[in-house]
Amino acid sequence: MHFLRRPISLRQRLILTIGAILLVFELISVFWLWHESTEQIQLFEQALRDNRNNDRHIMREIREAVASLIVPGVFMVSLTLFICYQAVRRITRPLAELQKELEARTADNLTPIAIHSATLEIEAVVSALNDLVSRLTSTLDNERLFTADVAHELRTPLAGVRLHLELLAKTHHIDVAPLVARLDQMMESVSQLLQLARAGQSFSSGNYQHVKLLEDVILPSYDELSTMLDQRQQTLLLPESAADITVQGDATLLRMLLRNLVENAHRYSPQGSNIMIKLQEDDGAVMAVEDEGPGIDESKCGELSKAFVRMDSRYGGIGLGLSIVSRITQLHHGQFFLQNRQETSGTRAWVRLKKDQYVANQI
């Protein structure tokens, strides 16, 4: 009984199934041939006993005998091929299920594949894939933890060095402004590295929440963003009478996304300019940030969303802002776009997120 419960290989299943089908239909064909041959022999014997040597009658009997063998033979071959096809399809069904499972997965879904099969090859493939996913998950988690730990540990000593420089400047009247500015840039870099590491940890378990973009993301960030823009006398304009849109995601990460978009616009826009946040609804939920800066080279949009790539080194930064935006957008299964504004100079950076279907259905 234990032997019967053991999984067998896909090759053995195919051979046994096709062999059984051919055997069954061969037996049916032999039985049919025996039955028809017996009937024809009896007819010929009857004709001989009755002295019916009519050639036309004999040829008709021969044609009937040939037809009685060919027609069932063609039918049997067609039926055999059809049943073999269905059998092979049934045996390879786990492969089709595995294909659908893999195609339906997102890049961040690293949970084990739950497909059970009594076929050795399928079990071996699923086991190998799950082992690969497990090792990949462990590697990514270790990388994120390492980045977060390093970034967190660097913030304290950098803040201490900055404090000592300020005390040194007050005590000895030394100009340490360039050093302080450089330290501020390093602290900003460390902060962005920490954000990027944390962004990759939030959705590992798939805990999505109902988030209203205006109420939960834009309005809570307004004071912080306005304070940042005041440094260059810039004005933050909120969506005008826009209806709120609900998405599935994490409000903290979406506020981080918005802050990085506004910070990028603030960095590359002239003093006294306006930076606008817009909301609109099409196939999904669109949140856009528009500025009045010089615009971008649209041929390099793909490069700008990569880590440590800057549009212009004169404006500072280390090029992680848009990489963080791209990463958070991916975690929300959305799309991130960069383009120049059509009606005037400036850049339009926007993300399209999936609307919350449950809330949409309730409406």
Swiss-Prot record:
> Biological process GO terms, please?
phosphorelay signal transduction system; response to iron(III) ion; response to zinc ion; signal transduction
Q: Which residues form a coiled coil?
A: none
Which EC class does it fall in?
A: transferase
Its taxonomic placement starts with: Bacteria, Pseudomonadati, Pseudomonadota, Gammaproteobacteria, Enterobacterales
- InterPro entries, from UniProt? HAMP_dom (IPR003660), HATPase_C_sf (IPR036890), His_kinase_dom (IPR005467), HisK_dim/P_dom (IPR003661), HisK_dim/P_sf (IPR036097), Sig_transdc_His_kin-like_C (IPR004358), TCS_sensor_his_kinase (IPR050428)
Q: What is this protein called?
A: Sensor protein BasS
Coarse class of the primary localization is membrane
Query: Reaction catalysed by this chain?
Result: ATP + protein L-histidine = ADP + protein N-phospho-L-histidine
Q: Which residues cross the membrane?
A: 14-34, 65-88
Residue ranges annotated for the HAMP domain, each copy included: 89-141
